[in-house]
């Protein structure tokens, strides 16, 4: 209803101003600005919906100020360009319409009415309401009743008798199991769901809407609200350190806790969270690659679900035979947005909807088959009678190729329980949320029926039943939940440990690199993660007088304030204000101690603008002074005009990447010498080793042969045509996820370059 009202007010404002207001520059500018704000708000809502599937939620506050990288980002580029072009066209059309009768005399009354209607359209828009509520949640002091509802359970389960298998299905919401809406999509797992305790109304709340947040909510009974962006939690050293979570209780009760997934454990800090709360045995992509049957059988995120669940079954067998009380948690990944992945062993590889194949539905159908196979193995085993199996979605599906069909249904998270000791078949329609999952499991295992804000759905009353406005209530509790981190409010001294790549201050520890915004009563950490912008881009968003401490590789800050460190990959500390003074210190000891030293200086806006502009220079446009191309730092020597076909810098150098160009091309600003030696320090990847690699300058071609280890080769070139471009052609680029950023499409690697140097020969 509010959408229709806001649009009607918008349309009325446009028509009244265009046909009645007449000519007046001030009123035109004011009305266009407010109407433009309406357009921007609604496009923001549309774009947020596209990425999150849930409008402008808590995570969008970070998306607006950080670049979006991660899984399938390339698939979002075209829609993003479309939004920008559409916005430009709408503004142009809006300005043209409003000035249709600019030659008519100005009418104050109609101008005022048009402006008021425009303001009303903004106020009535859902986007404005969502943003207002989010901003309020950032500035509240908390809610006084939080302490009354947040309850810590007993730290142990008296006389535990059951083992626990807990399966998180990535984005595998209960909506997929509606056989009327999606016929025969989930027959195998759906049949198992119907054999157990099926909780049909598990809603998603703020702070529970992405994987690590869903895990925290289900195991600790609280949303993941933190003094930093949730997926950046990989940088912290402990996770809600004061809270009692399900894993803590299990460990205290004699359980050995295991977690198995196909992706890297460091992503979003899952390893930190689990280690902080009772899990001593963690297996991710790095740990599994030496034990799986085919270490090369991977998708963009890690190992496929069939591989992961096979390893989980092996672990279940091993632990069951040992007689040790255990919990085994596992997380699938094949149903990750935007498209999902199809395991090669499942029978259900294709699902058609609306008369055409749908990749997301196909991934769901395949993944549920793999999960069902795993569960049926457990059910057929002699240990099932001592086991509780839990299946839940980590969160609702985000914007995938099935999302528009899901949105037509009443959407809920998946949560069902299969008890080997006491088979129960029932569908429970009680209102509940993800925070109730851990409390329900704890209750079944013989512990308390409450956990944080969660309550057992078998013997307690969910917050979703107590509060009709539970989403708003959850946001009201946000400051109280953030305070549970016990995060420091000041930073005066700090210590950098180079062996551990950590920074410590005021009792808190963070992984490097790290950016901190420091004010009188608040320290805001801004870590670097797969889903956030590089720290220098985040720093560029700081206000001129914001105090910062930035710990990163020296070359990243050298172009601004320490050019002598432009080629250094050591750690450096920079602090100051973008509009004031900045200092850069080289971390030259294994354990390095520093102090904050912010000065109240006069702000220079020209200096501020220069710093911001420099911080925003993209990596490939950075230039440094050197007599060779050093590949383990960003940018290129000043003599290089442009380059292509080269991947990002890594600690040792850079790979060629055929996804960015079939050839490595380095174009210099001036012609290369008439006679020169080309000194190449490099290695080959995979089948490119021991193969002739063409290297061309103008019409002349030499051959380079590399092995899998780094070597230095000198090639002799004559350049009679004054060519200015060096071309290297890897013979057989290999598609691989090795060394890739989690969630990115595979790179096609050919040669790994450490250094290339042009040395002019006499004569």
Curated annotation (Swiss-Prot):
Gene Ontology terms for molecular function: phosphatidylglycerol-membrane-oligosaccharide glycerophosphotransferase activity
Presence of the UniProt keyword Transmembrane helix in the record: yes
Enzyme Commission identifier(s): 2.7.8.20
Disulfide bonds: none
Domain of life: Bacteria
Record's catalysed reaction(s): a phosphatidylglycerol + a membrane-derived-oligosaccharide D-glucose = a 1,2-diacyl-sn-glycerol + a membrane-derived-oligosaccharide 6-(glycerophospho)-D-glucose
InterPro entries (alphabetical): Alkaline_phosphatase_core_sf (IPR017850), DUF7024 (IPR054288), OpgB (IPR020881), OpgB/LTA_synthase_biosynth (IPR050448), Sulfatase_N (IPR000917)
Protein's pathway: Glycan metabolism; osmoregulated periplasmic glucan (OPG) biosynthesis
Membrane-spanning ranges: 1-21, 26-46, 77-97, 108-128
Keyword Transmembrane: yes
Enzyme class: transferase
GO CC, one annotated term: plasma membrane
Main location per the UniProt record: membrane
Family, similarity comment: Belongs to the OpgB family.
PANTHER family per record: LIPOTEICHOIC ACID SYNTHASE (PTHR47371), PHOSPHOGLYCEROL TRANSFERASE I (PTHR47371:SF3)
NCBIfam families, per database record: PRK03776.1
Biological role stated in the UniProt entry: Transfers a phosphoglycerol residue from phosphatidylglycerol to the membrane-bound nascent glucan backbones.
Protein name (database record): Phosphoglycerol transferase I
Organism: Escherichia coli (strain SMS-3-5 / SECEC)
Gene label: mdoB
């Amino acid at each position: 209803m509010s959408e229709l009202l806001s649009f009607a007010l918008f349309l009325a404002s446009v028509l009244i101003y265009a046909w009645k207001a007449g000519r007046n520059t001030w009123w035109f500018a004011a009305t266009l600005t407010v109407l433009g704000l309406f357009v921007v708000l609604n496009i923001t809502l549309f774009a947020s919906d596209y990425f999150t599937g849930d409008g402008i939620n808590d995570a969008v506050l970070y998306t607006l100020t950080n670049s979006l990288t991660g899984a399938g980002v390339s698939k979002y580029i075209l829609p993003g360009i479309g939004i920008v072009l559409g916005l430009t066209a709408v503004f142009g059309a809006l300005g043209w319409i409003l000035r249709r009768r600019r030659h008519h005399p100005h009418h104050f009354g109609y101008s005022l009415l048009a402006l008021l209607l425009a303001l009303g359209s903004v106020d009535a828009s859902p986007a404005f309401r969502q943003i207002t509520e989010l901003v309020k949640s950032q500035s509240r002091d908390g809610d006084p009743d939080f302490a009354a509802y947040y309850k810590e359970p007993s730290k142990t389960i008296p006389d535990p008798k059951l083992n626990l298998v807990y399966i998180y299905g990535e984005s595998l919401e209960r909506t997929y199991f509606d056989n009327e809406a999606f016929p025969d999509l989930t027959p195998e797992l759906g049949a198992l769901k119907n054999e157990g305790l099926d909780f049909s109304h598990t809603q998603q709340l703020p702070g529970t809407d992405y994987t690590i947040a869903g895990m925290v909510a289900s195991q600790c009974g609280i949303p993941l609200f933190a003094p930093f962006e949730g997926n950046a939690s990989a940088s912290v050293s402990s996770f809600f350190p004061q809270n009692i979570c399900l894993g803590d209780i299990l460990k205290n009760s004699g359980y050995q806790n295991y977690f198995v997934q196909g992706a890297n454990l460091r992503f979003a800090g899952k390893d930190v969270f689990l280690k902080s709360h009772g899990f001593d045995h963690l297996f991710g992509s790095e740990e599994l690659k030496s034990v799986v049957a085919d270490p090369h059988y991977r998708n963009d995120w890690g190992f496929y679900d069939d591989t992961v669940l096979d390893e989980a079954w092996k672990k279940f067998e091993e632990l069951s035979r040992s007689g040790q009380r255990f919990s085994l948690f596992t997380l699938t990944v094949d149903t990750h947005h935007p498209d999902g992945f199809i395991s090669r062993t499942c029978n259900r590889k294709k699902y058609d909807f609306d008369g055409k194949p749908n990749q997301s539905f196909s991934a769901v159908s395949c993944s549920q088959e793999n999960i069902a196979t795993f569960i049926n193995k457990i059910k057929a085993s002699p240990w099932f009678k001592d086991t509780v199996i839990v299946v839940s979605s980590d969160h609702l599906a985000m914007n995938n190729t099935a999302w528009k069909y899901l949105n037509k249904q009443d959407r809920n998270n998946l949560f069902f329980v299969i008890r080997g000791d006491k088979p129960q078949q029932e569908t429970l329609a009680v209102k509940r949320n993800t925070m109730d999952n851990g409390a329900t499991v704890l209750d079944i295992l013989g512990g308390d029926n409450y956990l944080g804000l969660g309550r057992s759905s078998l013997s307690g009353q969910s917050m979703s039943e107590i509060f009709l406005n539970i989403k708003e209530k959850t946001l009201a509790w946000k400051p109280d939940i953030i305070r549970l981190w016990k995060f420091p409010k000041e930073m005066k001294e700090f210590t950098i440990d180079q062996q551990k790549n950590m920074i410590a201050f005021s009792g808190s520890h963070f992984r490097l690199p790290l950016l901190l915004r420091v004010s009188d009563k608040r320290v805001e950490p801004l870590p670097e993660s797969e889903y956030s912008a590089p720290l220098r881009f985040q720093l560029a968003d700081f206000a001129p007088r914001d105090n910062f401490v930035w710990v990163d590789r020296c070359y990243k800050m050298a172009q601004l304030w320490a050019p002598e460190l432009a080629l250094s990959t050591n750690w450096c500390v920079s602090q100051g204000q973008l509009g004031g003074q900045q200092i850069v210190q080289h971390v030259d000891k294994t354990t390095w101690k520093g102090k904050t030293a912010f000065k109240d200086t006069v702000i220079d806006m020209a200096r501020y603008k220069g710093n911001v502009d420099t911080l925003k220079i993209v990596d490939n446009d950075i230039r440094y002074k050197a007599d060779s191309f050093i590949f383990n730092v960003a940018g290129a020597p000043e003599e290089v005009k442009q380059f292509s076909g080269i991947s990002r810098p890594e600690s040792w150098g850079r790979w060629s990447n055929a996804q960015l160009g079939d050839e490595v091309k380095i174009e210099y600003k001036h012609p290369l010498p008439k006679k020169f030696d080309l000194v190449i320090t490099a290695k080959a990847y995979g089948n490119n080793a021991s193969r002739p690699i063409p290297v061309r300058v103008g019409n002349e071609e030499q051959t380079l042969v590399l092995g899998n280890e780094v070597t230095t080769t000198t090639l002799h070139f004559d350049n009679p045509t004054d060519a200015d471009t060096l071309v290297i052609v890897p013979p057989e680029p290999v598609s691989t996820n090795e060394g890739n950023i989690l969630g990115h499409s595979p790179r096609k690697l050919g040669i790994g370059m450490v250094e290339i140097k042009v040395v002019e020969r006499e004569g």
